[in-house]
Amino acid sequence: MKRLLLVLCYITLLAGCQKVVVEQEKTTPPLKPTQLIVGTLYGPQIYFTSGQGDSGYDYEMAERFANYLDLELKMKPFANISELYSAMHSGEIDIIAAGLADTPARREQFRLGPPLYRVNQVLVYRQGTPIPRSVDTLKGEITVTTDSSFVDTLTELQKSNPDLVWNQEKDKDAEELLTMIAAGEIPYTIADSTSLDINRRFMPELREGLVLKRKQPVVWLLPPTNSDKLMSELLSFWHIEKRSGTLAHLNEKYFAHVERFDYVDTRAFIRAIDNKLPKYQATFEKYAEGIDWRKLAATAYQESHWNPNARSPTGVRGLMMLTLPTAKQVGIKNRLDPYQSIKGGAKYLNSMLERLPDSIPESQRMWFALASYNIGLGHVEDARKLAQSQGLNPSAWRDVKSVLPLLQKRKYYQKTRYGYARGNEAVHYVDSIRRYYDTLVWIDNQNMLLELKQKPLQTAEAKETEEKPQTDAIQPQQP
């Protein structure tokens, strides 16, 4: 009997323990995530990787959002928009940040975040292709990416143009279609205006045609359900970034300097990369001293078009167009020696960087330094004070850039310490260097991708050579 009671007590205890475990499982809160997983697409203005690290508008915003949430950022690139959608619906990613526009179709599938920037949808064709006067004349000649906002636009246009048809590419992104346009493989596509502006630096043959949709918001996509907290956090973050000027800064950083396009200049620069840059690249890399060598090379191209014998009526000479006093200051004896010129230019540019106030953030210091290289640090400091007097941020390049042209107007320059300066030229100077730099980065990335593609082929060829029987070996002579 006692034994039976002991067994019953033991069973009761086990049942009680099981009950506690079940109750604990019910009340234990879900584990807090440690990562923000962001689905994206590769693209110059979206997300790309290089020897200098990760970059892109959406990447920078995602990095800031992850920091705001105190989470580790994980960028997860996909091959196309369809795969992005599938990953979101399966719960593989938390958010889509891929330069996608706000459309009715996307509103039906996802929750849309606040607008980051706005774009026009434009018809794109190659120089020499007949200029399209209306979309309805291009039956079957337009190619767009599957699931893109351009499909929605064409579907809408089809209601008033029933004969309008187009081709869709599932396995090619918008940039690949622009490449096909430049190569003459397809006649027409549709692109966002920002994407076209950026890609024309690398493919100057691209031309802008009809504007099909104006000022379309670019947004992030969130899951349609169970995303209330994430949406609330995103809205709070967006308001902070907008008030602080971060959104405006990123828009200026990625888009403002590419709006000015010069076909002849772009073609000449791409030719110079092939014909002239190889002579001096190692020297740029050697003397960059902490500066990205491509920024130094871009500066030299803006100064002299990489001509070591360049001269100007004002007395500046050489590849980096140094004045005589500047050459003496940096210890250069022969300004027409390209290697001395690069060394001196790098030293002078670094000195401009060092003399800038600490209040200027690292990401913008180079633009201030380049403006100082062009018109002098004193004039740039005048522009900073002028910006501050107008309620602008003297340490934000976008704000100082907006007031630099005022240094040419008597109303403003007579109140400054250093007087008149051609501020509009400094703005153009910096914007041009930024465009040249972006082109060099893009070409570097393309070369890196090409090398990665070639490695498996080279490995396979080497393995095949090793396994091949040596039929051509020298045979010993017969006696």
Swiss-Prot record:
Main location (coarse class): membrane
Signal peptide: 1-15
PROSITE patterns, A to Z: PROKAR_LIPOPROTEIN
GO cellular component: cell outer membrane
Bias kind Basic and acidic residues: ranges: 461-470
Region spans: Disordered: 457-479
Region (LT domain): 260-479
Family: In the N-terminal section; belongs to the bacterial solute-binding protein 3 family.
Enzyme class (EC, first level): lyase
Record's subcellular location: Cell outer membrane
Residue segments, region Non-LT domain: 16-258
SUPFAM superfamilies xref list: Lysozyme-like, Periplasmic binding protein-like II
Gene Ontology BP annotations: cell wall macromolecule catabolic process; cell wall organization; peptidoglycan catabolic process
Keywords: Cell outer membrane, Cell wall biogenesis/degradation, Lyase, Membrane, Signal
Disulfide bond annotation, renumbered to this chain: none
Protein name, per record: Membrane-bound lytic murein transglycosylase F
Catalytic reaction annotation: Exolytic cleavage of the (1->4)-beta-glycosidic linkage between N-acetylmuramic acid (MurNAc) and N-acetylglucosamine (GlcNAc) residues in peptidoglycan, from either the reducing or the non-reducing ends of the peptidoglycan chains, with concomitant formation of a 1,6-anhydrobond in the MurNAc residue
CDD domains registered for this protein in UniProt: MLTF-like, PBP2_YfhD_N
Gene3D superfamilies in alphabetical order: 1.10.530.10, Periplasmic binding protein-like II
Membrane topology value: Peripheral membrane protein
Role summary: Murein-degrading enzyme that degrades murein glycan strands and insoluble, high-molecular weight murein sacculi, with the concomitant formation of a 1,6-anhydromuramoyl product. Lytic transglycosylases (LTs) play an integral role in the metabolism of the peptidoglycan (PG) sacculus. Their lytic action creates space within the PG sacculus to allow for its expansion as well as for the insertion of various structures such as secretion systems and flagella.
Residues of the active site: 303
